[in-house]
Amino acid sequence: MNKILQQPSWPNQQQYLKIISRIKQYPQLVYPNEINRLKLELKEVAKGNKFIIQGGDCAETFKNFSEDLIKGKLKILLQMSAIIQYSTKLKIVNIGRIAGQYIKPRTHSHETRDGVTLPAYRGDGVNSIDFNKHKRQPNPKRLIQAYHQSASTMNLIRSLIMNGFTDISQIKLWNQDLLSNSPLGVKYKTIVKNITSMLDFIHDSGLVNNKYNDSDSFNLYTSHEAILLDYEKAFMNKNFCCSAHMLWVGDRTRDVNSEHIKFISKLDNPVAVKIGPTINEDDICKIYEKIN
């Protein structure tokens, strides 16, 4: 087996393995039927019938976690989705970098400040961003908190969708600040006004019932970078990795012979590979052949 890149140096390997075993007993974060639904939607994207929006934090944190913050992220995706769908006439596939983006790759394993060298910050799922000897030590207990916050985020998103928060008739309430603070705010406010007028007409004319919160109106799929492979493998359900609907391999771990590429090549999830400026065409072809 090749060396697994970008893995933390856990001070207590036995404790780490016990926590991974514990996480294996936890409920899945997503389900195979949801993953298969995303695959069907992505087929329509490939045919030119749908359009993907993927958005979210570079890395989620334990501190910036609340119902309002999650709603805020969802509102931004909703606003973009509605505007792009109205402008292109294409249905939108919404994929969030959310509910699992708690681990970061690093260029260097350590960081030095004022002559003090400590382990690099690898995301809240591994250690703290605080430059402190104790807090920078990789702590596997953080994986449990990452799981619980991911699960709470998923529960809130599902609840909001079921209760009509994502109904397009609520478009005027979705992140109005996004429009007012944008240089193109006037243009997009006009689009929102047109969408609202269209919905009002449909409702007033009695052409259809003014309910858009059915299961086909808006779905938010989750995604994150698959870095810590032991954690990802804890969510395996046959060939599905149920930590997220879609997983990707980053630029630092995408060598065609890496364990990360080997892992995603065996999944039934939709997967992706980040293509950076250092890659060449031959590598892209080799990765494509490997994961397909």
What do the predicted segments below correspond to?
Residues 1-51:
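N-terminal basic/disordered segments at the start of proteins
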Residues 59, 65-292:
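Active-site-facing alpha/beta catalytic cores
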Residues 24-28, 32, 44-80:
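N-terminal ordered "arm"
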